[in-house]
From Swiss-Prot:
The modification O-(pantetheine 4'-phosphoryl)serine is found at S1766. One of its GO terms (cellular component) is plasma membrane. This is Atrochrysone carboxylic acid synthase Agnpks1. It is an enzyme of class 2 (transferase). Residues 1500-1648 are annotated as: C-terminal hotdog fold. PROSITE patterns: CARRIER, KS3_1, KS3_2, PKS_MFAS_DH. The gene is Agnpks1.
Length: 1807
């Protein structure tokens, strides 16, 4: 008897049946894993794959891995996130949890197929002759997934084909598992919280018949009316057993309730991935979905079935003629047909008889029961000898010793996808760098002052010890600029961190930003798979700058290993980080190392580069003495005949690299492609520093060979080209020999261009390689070669004289280098090390990338974000500028680039627009409102609530763009529609697919199913975008979708309930007999208006939103009544009056259906019930009775929301999303729960779906909801390109420790002792250059007069008697403080002196001292025997301009000067003009004085006499000596006053304008602010940093009588800053004015910090002062006498000798529990304060100073959120010192940003 149909003649079985065969072979693939340890099997297969004898096995594992990677990339984000990083498919064997979860079917499928096919390949590679399968009469059989594996063998003609065919099997297995899981979860959702072994979907029952089982199933499922899709069915049968399958819960229920199944033995099978062999669930479309891929089409073109595979349902071979048909047969078999192994046995036995076989070899992996049965049947055939061969043991076998070996490195092309730089010459980005190169600039300059004093450290004669022989270099502008807060660094840490590290961090961010990097967006950007690699060859900043102030961050901020480590730490990369030093080749060697990591699979993305910032004069001196450096003023004179060494340079560059296939899959911009890289050593050179042409040429050829590139195809070589005679000559020889040899001549059409970037920007040493790499990448991008500018005089004469013949060309001007279609431009970068190493990298241009499709979306989201308002403004401005420069920019690409391909920070702007013009308009509007912009909280994303719309918002037919263009949404709809059709309902697709007009009416079953299924699909679509609900609420019909999304109902049961209910309504209720009317009124208002009319309340939607139901006649009667009272009414377009008596006829039947066939489960997220007006958490509340009541009873949406709010399920921060075809519920939510953070619709009637989605996504994004933007763009990514947008706009400030003095010259030697006068008596002051000498200007030490320009420098000793008396006559905090009037006298003296020097004939000189700014208070030493020198310079470039600039400095003991502590501008003027300009103000001032007189007479203003005024002033702040006490009386009202002044007649001192005269007429302003009862003088004091102008039109004379007037007002920008104008009157005329005098208010507790003598060892740490001009974080340098620099928090470490406890990372504070599923967390633990510990007292101080309750200071409270700013930080720090003895600085709260962090630190060190 035959058990198969006659196959077509082209089937492979025909070939087997023609003729008699003596031997048959059957290869059997099981559906069970071998009993061997799976990890061991894969590990041994992996080890075999490394052996060169098993290239096919290796290729199979590689191809299988690539196939899985490709399928993983296509997964939705929520599934992709489940898969850990993997290097090879065999890694999945280690993912135990994954094999239990949602992807278990896919993972086990690929593992089983991999181990079986890998084992088979390993077996046949060892026995290649045995794979002559066709002539050997081979047939194939398998079970389950094993049947799928047979396809690989059937299609393969040779073993070498198996990697390709096997990879397709792996792909199909993975796709099959995904589909099976997705479909099965609609039948019974998996419990995501259960991590134990899942329940089985299949049980085997031995010793029963299939008919018995089917009869019992029919009976039981008929009783409970189980939906068709959820029914249990027979999935496999044999003579001795039957296997049944179905949803696990239903199987378990069946075994509990059925006596038949209870009485029979059953065994659960390890089937956890879902249902197969289910013809009632799956369709041919499902088969096509799995099989028909682009890779399958490729397989069809190369392979066709060679061997027969026996069907497990018929026993006959599959009649397939190509790969697609074969896989469709097999997938269809697995999905839709029951297994009947007996038929396979019969079919094989029949075949053996038909061909007359005498021997049959059965090849198995391990023996099993099906093979036992098959072998037993074959043995009954007469004359047939049967044997079984297990091949798993071959996996465990070891190769004989001495055989095999490594297979070789895996070579991929490496794509460079991002770049950034900081280069000399102002090249702060790659575009400016190209402009520099293209312009042919040489950007050398003298060593700038921020590095070291070039004059003292440079000696061209080479005689001075440790001095440089050259004063030149190429330098980055302002290398200290850095956005410390962005990178989570305190000012102190930033200041002490090497600028190389900082700029590496910045350029890494910019390069990643340009690469479109977003963490974990793709497999290649998984944080575990990213590493950093940076070259650095020196630690200048640590050795020189920060070594002057060694503190906490000296090691991590200065040691080079921390550079790449810091990048990894900031970005949270957990791949490797390397800092590599190979001298001048460091960065290119590092890039090669990064390539190796990519080639080896150690990382999937690499960030690499190099850094060099020069601050150490030692290196200049050492390289000078080593004869490396040129002494001439130029960058490197590369290839010049007079080349004499190189010019040192700064540079920082970063690039981002990926394997090319990953970059293309990630849709990256590919700037260039590295084909090969290698390093060798010039071992045979004459010295370690000397190059060797032979080794260099060998390396060049080696790299070309590895890349598979003809050396003649190289079009450009970027040479090392340092400009040394030896280096240039050796390199040109090596380059010409490698790429332009004499043996193979280049043609004129194929020249070799050479260049060297060092001729533009110098030799940046460790960064030279990446600098050269960036140049080449820019050449690819710009299609041009920039001019070479190194040849200043003539070409090096020792160069080969046949360069022209070899077609080697030097581009002396910009040369076009265009892209040629069909041919890649190829370039080489050379980088050599002074230590002997040579590194060469060969690159080609990136592939041309063009969009292959069109994005159909009409509206797009554009997002801009930053970490600060300043940067947000800058980022918006940059985008606007980009759009101006690129008017043709694609909006779709802009959206994709700013959303899916950028990091999103807490200051956000997102807009939805349909055109670039709209984008510009909206961004401009956002720009104008940046200052009022509020950032999203940093505490985490807000909870999300889904609200599901009822039928009242639906419309008859809708054309969903999502259905047509979103594969994910479409797949969800199709799966749900298939379930509906499987349950006997008509397809609802016509309602949503656009096939009908919007007003086309469908049946109620179709309409209601369409609504609910659309809402389910929308909710899941939101989930695919990463937006998942923490709580749900459904309105009326929408509640069914809500219950499904919450996990209460399966999709199958949801469809069953909705469809059956609609069918009952159609059957038992009359359409149109009843109506529903929405009324804009409350229940009370309706009752008051229409209480006597009959109606039913259907919905209570909001405070004034109510829906009535009832018969149409009753509704017709009530509407005019309600509208007559002003209540707007409108009828809902619904067929039936839900929630009214009209539904009564269906209630019993509906409840019965729900009771019999539906499983209600506990919700996985809270459900807000409008029926029960409560939040449901349990598995009892929702049942058949519930759905009955929900049909009939009112929807109390209002009360449900209020209850949810009251118990904390939702709050003001909740983000609401309406799930439905048109928004209705969001209006109810806003009116009920106002204020609402954000409430948005999913779809809107009349609007394109993507317009609504874009608007909603933009709003959610700005509210802080995390959106998976990549998933939003994924269906359209083929149409999208990443734009090269401007990089982040940094909020930079300067962080820099200046090298002070010349200790780098003098260290450890006596060479300079004589020069400095050391080891002898203290040096006298420098010899005076002039005889001028006053009490404040002691001697002129420098004088330079050149025509109209001039400079005068003076030095004075503050300890000289008159000067010291002037300082101590102005005491603050018992310290002598140099008042601004002293600075004014100095200014008048020097200004007059300089003016008369330049204009000797001038007699009287009048000056306006403008813009005086005192950055640091000048405080006198207590010891008068000491010296305390200051230096002041005055300079003018043109006295004709009538201006000069003044600068004040402190002078150190070694004669060096500090940073300037004060500055001013002198403006020479005409006093008559001043007097005239003040005339209009005189009567106003006099009027105010008269008003103050009147207020004083009436007792409103205060009048103080001379003694009382100065007593109050002394008690408040300043204790003046008698000479300064000129005010005879003061009248004061609030912040306004006038004083009568008589100047002292006491003589003494030599002054230009005596300071006590100036102070007497001007210090009224300080008196007002420090004495007035309008100020809190008990807790605060005010001091001045300067004024805008000081003009005295008449001289101040001893004994002169004056009147001063001032009114101080707080500034709008900063209420702690006060401004005013002091008017000086004489005889009723304004004769002088101090304009724009400024005071700042400080807490009094800081007085000691601000004003302590420099030589006081017991002084507290010096605090910071104020400036309106200098950047916040500009650090002070050491040795400052007085107040340190502007707003920079004082250093915590050892200021003024006070030892402090070292800081630790503040990361161990207690954090608040985040909200889960929308439920608010319990209140954070309050800080313990009821103890006498230092910690408790510290917390109490913080509470007192910040004005907060102790309850507010929870461990998770951040100081920034509590309002602890830099000033309050100083106050609290001073309180800690004074009250607790805890010495800290104001930066403490930057380093320990939360209460918990600070508490942990205090407890560690002070408890």
């Amino acid at each position: 008897m035959r058990y198969c149909t006659i196959p077509p003649v082209h089937s492979p079985i025909i070939r087997l049946q023609h003729g008699i065969l003596s031997k048959m072979k059957l290869i059997y693939f099981s559906n069970e894993f071998p009993p061997d340890d799976l990890h061991t099997l894969f590990r041994e297969l992996h080890n075999h794959s490394k052996d060169r004898r098993h290239p096919i096995l290796a290729r199979f594992l590689e191809e299988a891995t690539l196939a899985v990677r490709e399928e993983v990339r296509r997964l939705p984000a929520h599934l992709r996130a489940l898969i850990p990083p993997f290097e090879s498919i065999w890694n999945f064997a280690d993912f135990a949890d994954l094999r239990k979860g949602q992807l278990c079917g896919s993972i086990d499928g690929i593992l089983l197929c991999s181990v079986e096919l890998g084992t088979l390949i390993r077996y046949y590679e060892n026995n290649p002759d045995a794979f002559n399968l066709e002539t050997g009469g081979t047939i194939l059989a398998g079970l389950g997934i094993g049947l799928l594996a047979t396809a690989a063998v059937s299609l393969a003609s040779t073993v070498a084909d198996l990697p390709i065919t096997g990879a397709q099997v792996i792909r199909q297995a993975f796709r099959l598992g995904i589909l099976v899981d997705e479909v099965s979860q609609n039948l019974q959702p998996r419990d995501a919280t259960d991590t134990s072994t899942p329940d089985s979907w299949a049980y085997v029952l031995p010793n029963v018949s299939a008919s018995e089982v089917q009869q019992e199933l029919d009976t039981m499922q008929g009783i409970v009316k189980t939906p068709e899709a959820s029914k249990i069915f027979i999935s496999a049968l044999s003579a001795t057993a039957v296997t049944i399958s179905g949803p696990p819960a239903r199987l378990q229920a069946m075994f509990r309730t059925s006596q038949f199944f209870h009485d029979h033995k059953s065994v659960a099978l390890p089937v956890y991935g879902g249902l197969c062999h289910a013809k009632h669930i799956y369709t041919v479309e499902d088969v096509h979905h799995i099989v028909r891929t682009s890779s399958m089409a490729l397989l069809d073109s190369k392979f066709s079935p060679q061997l027969p595979i026996h069907s497990t349902s018929t026993g006959a071979p599959f009649p397939a003629v190509n790969a697609t048909e074969l896989f469709e047969h097999i997938i269809g078999e697995i999905l839709m047909r029951a297994i009947q192994w007996d038929k396979v046995i019969q079919g094989v036995a029949q075949l053996a008889q038909d061909v007359g076989a005498t021997r049959c070899e059965i090849v198995v992996f391990r023996n099993s029961l099906p093979i036992h049965d098959l072998a037993a049947a074959l043995k009954t055939i007469p004359g047939l000898e049967t044997s079984t061969q297990e091949i798993i043991p071959w996996v465990h076998s070891k190769p004989p010793a001495g055989e095999g070996g490594p297979r070789g490195p895996l070579q991929s092309k490496i794509a460079i996808v991002g770049m950034s730089c900081r280069m000399p010459g102002g090249a702060t980005d790659t575009e400016k760098f190209w402009e520099l190169l293209e312009s042919g600039l040489d950007v050398h300059r003298k060593i700038p002052a921020d590095r070291f004093d070039v004059d003292s450290h440079y000696d061209p004669a080479g005689k001075r010890l440790n001095a440089s022989h050259t004063p030149y270099g190429c330098f980055i502008d302002e290398p200290g600029l850095f956005d410390a807060p962005f990178f989570n660094m305190s000012p102190r840490e930033a200041q002490q961190t090497d600028p190389m590290q900082r700029l590496a961090l910045v350029t890494a961010y910019e390069a990643l930003e340009r690469a479109g990097y977003v963490a974990n967006r793709t497999a290649a950007t998984d944080l575990h798979r990213i590493g950093t690699f940076y070259g650095q060859a020196s630690d200048d900043y640590r050795e020189v700058n920060s070594a002057q102030e060694i503190s906490t961050y000296f090691i991590p901020g200065g040691c080079r290993a921390f550079g790449p480590g810091r990048i990894n730490y900031f970005f949270k990369f957990s791949g490797p980080s390397y800092s590599i030093d190979t001298a001048c080749s460091s960065s290119l060697a590092t890039i090669q190392t990064a390539c190796a990591a990519l080639w080896n699979g150690d990382v999937d993305t690499a960030v690499a580069g190099g850094t060099n910032v020069l601050t150490n004069s030692d290196a200049f001196a050492g390289l000078s003495h080593g004869h490396f450096l040129s002494k001439t003023p130029n960058a490197c004179k590369t290839w010049d005949c007079n080349a004499d060494g190189y010019c040192r340079a700064d540079a920082v560059g970063s690039i981002v690299m990926k394997r090319l296939e990953d970059a293309e899959a990630d849709n990256d911009n590919i700037l260039g492609v590295i084909l090969a890289a290698a390093t060798n050593h010039s071992a045979e050179a004459i010295s370690i520093t000397h190059p060797h042409a032979g080794h260099q040429a060998y390396l060049g050829k080696l790299v070309a060979n590895r890349a598979g590139i003809d050396p003649l195809d190289v079009g450009f070589v970027e040479m090392h080209g340092t400009g040394t005679q030896a280096g240039d000559a050796e390199e040109i020889q090596s380059v010409t020999n490698a790429y332009a040899p004499t043996t193979r001549r280049r043609t004129a059409k194929n020249p070799l261009y050479i260049g060297a970037v060092k001729s533009n920007v110098g030799h940046s040493e460790a960064a030279a390689g990446v600098t050269a790499m960036l140049k080449v990448l820019l050449m690819f991008q710009k299609n041009a070669i920039p001019p070479h500018v190194g040849i200043k005089t003539g070409l090096n004469p020792i160069f080969p004289n046949d360069l022209d013949k070899r077609q080697v060309r030097i581009p002396y001007e910009r040369t076009e280098w265009p892209h040629v279609p069909g041919k890649k431009r190829v370039a080489v970068v050379n980088n050599f090390s002074a230590a002997g190493g040579n590194t060469t990298i060969l690159l080609e241009e990136g592939p041309v990338q063009e969009a292959t499709e069109t994005d159909p979306r009409s509206t797009h989201v554009v997002a801009v974000s930053a970490k600060s308002k300043i940067s947000l403004k800058g980022n918006i401005e940059r985008i606007l500028a980009y759009l101006e420069q690129h008017p043709d920019a694609s909006l779709a690409n802009l959206s994709y680039s700013t959303t899916a391909r950028r990091y999103h920070h807490n200051h956000r702007v997102a807009i939805a627009a349909s055109g670039i013009a709209q984008v510009k308009k909206q961004l401009q509007s956002a720009l104008d409102s940046v200052d009022s912009h509020k950032p999203i909280p940093t505490t985490g994303a807000p909870p999300v609530a889904f609200t599901f719309t009822g039928q009242g918002a639906s419309y008859k037919s809708y054309n969903l763009e999502l259905f047509s263009s979103s594969p994910y949404f479409r797949s969800q709809i199709l799966h749900l529609d298939a379930i509906a059709q499987g349950q006997g309902f008509a397809s609802f697709l016509p309602v949503i697919d656009g096939s009908h007009q919007r007003d086309h009416q469908h049946s109620q079953v179709m309409t209601q199913l369409a609504l609910v299924c659309t809402e389910i699909a929308i909710a899941k679509y939101w989930g695919s975008l990463g937006v998942k609900p923490d709580v749900v609420i459904g309105h009326s019909l929408g509640e069914y979708a809500a219950l499904h999304i919450a996990g209460v109902l399966s999709a199958s049961d949801t469809i069953f309930l909705v469809g059956q209910r609609a069918a009952l309504l159609e059957k038992k209720c009359k359409v149109g007999s009843h109506n529903m009317v929405a009324v804009r009124a409350s229940l009370a208002q309706i009752e008051a208006s229409a209480g006597k009319y009959p109606y039913e309340i259907a919905c209570i939607n909001g405070p004034k939103e109510t829906v009535l139901s009832g018969p149409t006649t009753e509704m017709d009667a009530i509407i005019p009544v309600l509208e007559g009272d002003g209540h707007k009414c409108y009828r809902l377009e619904v067929a039936f009056a839900f929630h009214s008596a009209q539904t009564d006829p269906i209630l019993d039947g509906f409840e019965a259906l729900a009771n019999s066939g539906v499983l209600f489960q506990a919700p996985q997220i809270p459900v807000i019930s409008p029926l029960l007006c409560k939040v449901i958490f349990d598995d009892k509340s929702v049942n058949a009775r519930y759905v009955r009541r929900a049909t009939r009873e009112p929807v109390n949406f209002l009360s449900a929301l209020e209850i949810a709010r009251d118990i904390g399920i939702v709050d003001d921060e909740t983000a609401w999303i309406e799930i439905g075809p048109h928004p209705v519920c969001v209006g109810f939510i806003k009116s009920t729960l106002s204020p609402v953070n954000v409430a948005v619709p999913s779809l809107r009637r009349g609007d394109d779906n993507y317009t609504t989605m874009a608007q909603s996504l933009a709003a959610l994004h700005c509210a802080g909801v995390k959106v998976e933007w990549s998933e939003f763009h994924r269906p359209f990514e083929a149409a999208l390109r990443l734009l090269d947008l401007p990089t982040y706009a940094w909020n930079d400030k300067t962080y820099w420790i200046q090298y002070i003095g010349d200790w780098a010259l003098t260290k450890g030697n006596t060479f300079y002792d004589k020069e400095k006068g050391l080891n002898s008596a203290p040096a006298a002051l420098p010899t005076p250059k002039s005889s001028i000498s006053t009490s404040t200007v002691h001697q002129i030490i420098q004088e330079s007069i050149d025509g109209e320009a001039g400079t005068v420098v003076m030095q004075s000793d503050l300890m000289q008697a008159d000067f010291r008396a002037a300082a101590w006559g102005h005491k603050m905090n018992q310290c002598g403080v140099v008042t601004s009037s002293v600075h004014a006298d100095i200014a008048y003296t020097l200004g007059e002196y300089l003016y008369k020097k330049l204009k000797p004939k001038s007699k009287q000189v009048h000056m306006n001292i403008a813009n005086l700014e005192v950055l640091k208070g000048l405080i006198a030493n207590k010891n008068p025997e000491s010296h305390q020198l200051i230096q002041v310079s005055v300079t003018t470039s043109d006295i004709g301009s009538n201006t000069a600039e003044l600068t004040w400095y402190n002078v150190h003991a070694d004669g060096t000067v500090d940073e300037p502590f004060a500055s001013a501008t002198l403006i020479y003027g005409d006093p008559s003009e001043w007097l005239s300009s003040w005339i209009p103000m005189t009567h106003l001032v006099q009027g105010r004085i008269h008003e103050l007189e009147r207020l004083a007479e009436s007792g409103v203003a205060n009048r103080f006499n001379h003694q009382m005024a100065y007593l109050l002033f002394a008690n408040s702040l300043v204790d003046y000596a008698a000479k300064y006490r000129g005010m005879q009386s003061v009248v004061l009202h609030e912040l306004e006053a006038f004083a009568d002044v008589v100047l002292s007649t006491e003589s003494g001192g030599r002054w230009t304008v005596p300071p006590y005269f100036i102070d007497s007429v001007a210090h009224l302003a300080g008196f007002v602010l420090n004495v007035s009862d309008a100020m809190d003088t008990q807790n605060n004091f005010c001091i001045t940093p300067g004024w805008r102008s000081m003009r005295l039109a008449r001289p101040l004379v001893a004994g002169g009588r004056y009147r001063s007037y001032v009114k101080m007002i707080p500034t709008a920008e900063d209420p702690s800053v006060y401004l005013g104008d002091v008017y000086v009157l004489q005889d009723g005329v304004v004769v002088g004015m101090v304009g724009g005098i400024q005071f700042r208010r400080y807490p009094r507790i800081l007085l000691s910090r601000f004003f302590s003598a420099p030589d006081d060892a017991h002084a507290p740490p010096v605090a910071t002062s104020t400036s309106s001009k200098h950047a916040v974080a500009t650090p002070a340098t050491k040795g400052v006498n007085g107040v340190k620099a502007v707003k920079a928090a004082p250093a915590v470490n050892g200021t003024n000798g006070v030892k402090t406890v070292p800081a630790v990372n503040g990361t161990n504070g207690v954090k608040a529990t985040p909200a889960v599923n929308g439920v608010k967390p319990a209140p954070p633990v309050e800080v313990e304060v009821n103890s006498d510990t230092t910690t408790a007292k510290a917390i109490q101080i913080i509470a007192a100073e910040s004005g907060l309750d102790l309850a507010d200071l929870t461990d998770d409270s951040s100081f920034a959120d509590l309002g602890v700013d830099s000033l309050m930080s100083l106050v609290i720090a001073e309180k800690f010192r004074a009250d607790l003895g805890v010495v800290v600085g104001g930066s403490l709260f930057l380093e320990y940003p939360t209460i918990g962090d600070l508490r942990s630190w205090l407890e560690e060190y002070y408890s």
